Structure formats: structure tokens, C-alpha cells
């Protein structure tokens, strides 16, 4: 049923109308509709109807289901009326970050920006690392950790890389990826960086953003090992090449 007895469109009709609306606003290459897993059968009907009405739009529309978010402490429950909204969760995470950086003497505007950036990264990482179709178990403490698998850890690694680049810029040093130092042994970090294009392409083709999360976490881990074992700004003949590795790391993490 697409039109009820009162002549009003049902949800099915609205979804099909939305598909036409998207096409009218600007022809798209692919439209991905993400809903809760409970909507899977409902969208089978929608997609079947759309394929009959407008096959071209249906061919480039994909429906993906995802699980629901649950908290590790089990405190969220719709029956108890304490469901947390996305904005509410971000605000809560930002408040926790604010407490952690309260002694850093940031200006108010700067502190607010940092709080928001870290909160968003924490939530995005926690959501995107989970394969579609499965429930997301959200642990606030792990999500805000600067160690291990978390958004803030990725941010910390990128800030560390950019700090090295800023120091190099102040000294008027230039990254040189074209001159491989004599006797240089390829580092694990370099091998990871080479995989960036294929990782992004595979994630796109498979609609699997969790692959990018896994990859960027590995890059961050390898970079921190590289940073701990190598003195980048050492005045040696390999300095320019090592700087190029740091710059490439910064670019890759930023674009993930």
C-alpha cells in the first residue's frame, strides 16, 4: 500500500519520492541508504517497487542496514526513557574532554574547539570501526582514550607528525621523497603508507568504512613506532627523506 484510505502517502511512497528528489537535485553516481537492521524487509519492498518504476535510479541506490548503538555500561534504555541523542552524546563527550584539558590554560574559544574536535573523532571512530549490520557497543572511556584504538589516538598521532613538520619548517628544512638515503631499509610505516590508495578504493567498492578505520589505526601505530625509534631532525643525509615520510603520514591520516 503506497496511498492509504485517506489519500496520504505511506512511508514506502515517501522513500520512493525521496529517491526521485535526490535525482532531481543533482544526478548522483550512487545513493546509499542506511537504516536500522529492522528495516531490511521494508526496504526490500521499496527497492523492488523503485526498480519497477525507475530502474535507472534503483540501479544506483543501495540499502545497507546497521545495528543499534548500545552503551557498555548498559545505561541507555528506551523503556526507561533515558535514550541519548547524538547531539546529547557529543555534548557529554565534550564535557569529559573539557575536564581533562582544564589545566592546559587554553583560551575559551580554543578549548571549545578542541573539545568538539575530540568528541566528534571519538564518536565517529567508535561508529565507523564496526562492520555494518552489527550492533555498536560504545564505551565512553575507551572512545576518549589517547592510547589504542580510538579517534583521539589518531588525532594525537597526526598532531605529533605536524609538530615535527612545523619544527622542520622553522629550520627551513624541506622534505625530500625523491632521494633514497644510501643503505636505507624500508620501514614498516612506508609499506603501510603505500597501501593508502588501494585501501580507500576497496573500502569504497565494498562500502566498508571499517576498513579505513583499521588502516588508519595501523598507520598511526606504525608512525608512533617510527617516531620513537628514529630521530627525524638529526641533520643527517637521511633527514629530508625521513621528513617526507612524516609528511606523507600527516597527509594520509588527515585524508582518512
Indicate residue ranges for each PLM-predicted region:
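Non-catalytic interaction-recognition regions
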Residues: 1-256
Amino acid at each position: 500500500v503506497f496511498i492509504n484510505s485517506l489519500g496520504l502517502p505511506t512511508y514506502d511512497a515517501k522513500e520512493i519520492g525521496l529517491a526521485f528528489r535526490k535525482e532531481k537535485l543533482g544526478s548522483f553516481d550512487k545513493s546509499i541508504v542506511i537504516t536500522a537492521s529492522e528495516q531490511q524487509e521494508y526496504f526490500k519492498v521499496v527497492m523492488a517497487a523503485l526498480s519497477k518504476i525507475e530502474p535507472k535510479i534503483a540501479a544506483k541506490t543501495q540499502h545497507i542496514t546497521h545495528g543499534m548503538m548500545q552503551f557498555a555500561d548498559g545505561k541507555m534504555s528506551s523503556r526507561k526513557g533515558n535514550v541519548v541523542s547524538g547531539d546529547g552524546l557529543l555534548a557529554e563527550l565534550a564535557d569529559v574532554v573539557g575536564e581533562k584539558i582544564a589545566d592546559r590554560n587554553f583560551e575559551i574559544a580554543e578549548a571549545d574547539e578542541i573539545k568538539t574536535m575530540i568528541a566528534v573523532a571519538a564518536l565517529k571512530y567508535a561508529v565507523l570501526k564496526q562492520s555494518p549490520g552489527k550492533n555498536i557497543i560504545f564505551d565512553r572511556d575507551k572512545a576518549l582514550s589517547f592510547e589504542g584504538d580510538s579517534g583521539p589516538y589518531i588525532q594525537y598521532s597526526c598532531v605529533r607528525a605536524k609538530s615535527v613538520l612545523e619544527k622542520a619548517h622553522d629550520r627551513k628544512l624541506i622534505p625530500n621523497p625523491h632521494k633514497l638515503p644510501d643503505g636505507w631499509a624500508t620501514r614498516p610505516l612506508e609499506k603501510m603508507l603505500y597501501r593508502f590508495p588501494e585501501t580507500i578504493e576497496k573500502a569504497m567498492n565494498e562500502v566498508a568504512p571499517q576498513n579505513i578505520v583499521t588502516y588508519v589505526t595501523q598507520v598511526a601505530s606504525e608512525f608512533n613506532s617510527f617516531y620513537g625509534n628514529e630521530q627525524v631532525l638529526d641533520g643527517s643525509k637521511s633527514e629530508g627523506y625521513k621528513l617526507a615520510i612524516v609528511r606523507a603520514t600527516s597527509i594520509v591520516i588527515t585524508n582518512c
